[in-house]
């Protein structure tokens, strides 16, 4: 970038030192951002220039700005609702008890959303910075799945949603019990949220060469192709999720992805042949398992 280099030289000549960030094109037509620093030698009239590749630093800074922007946006809505409804109740403007109850429910709903978001952010931060202590050992996968399904079955009672389990042969996986429970809970809770009434959630396992694949399928509306690429991003919520009254921080699937990766597995989504979506993830087989 000759123009930037000339500018750097003129500034250094005038002030004896100068710094400038600029973009350079490499031989393969890719570009990198660099920090150019130029200083005049104390013993000679020569100028010394040092170039630092700051492409990764700029990327991290952009990610941080995006994160702060997203957090601010996501926090603003529930806080505004809580404040507006609280002010209305405090002012005594509502004489109708039923209407007051509606406002109180809105406050509670958004307070829960805020609480989930803060908890999710803290959990995600701990995972991403390696602060989550994992005790990876051989676990009975079927036992953990059954335990999670039992703890969540109350979610399907009112809407008559059932869970069907289809297991392969005996499967032990290498995982942290708390991480596995969190992954299963998040995915099965999501399946309940977006399943149609009187439908069935299917949980199945497939034995692969070195891993076990776990599939959780629902009979909801499914996820569009356009949204699939963003489904595991922080704060992303599908159009259907935004249209419902379900609480959600948009962090659950981001946590799932990070936890699965921490356990040396993979995670993804695919559409069902009939209706709904299938979330899948893999975990390493326990070494004692037969191939």
Predicted feature descriptions by range:
Residues 1-56:
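PAS-family sensory/regulatory modules and their coupling/dimerization elements
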Residues 109-114:
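Short alpha-helical segment of the dimerization/phosphotransfer core of two-component systems
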Residues 198-210:
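Short beta-strand/loop element within the Bergerat-fold HATPase_c
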Residues 66, 223-235:
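Short conserved segment of the HATPase_c
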Residues 264-265:
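Conserved glycine-rich
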Residues 135-139, 157, 162-171:
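Conserved catalytic submotifs in the C-terminal HATPase_c
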Residues 129-134, 172-175:
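Conserved micro-motifs of the catalytic ATP-binding
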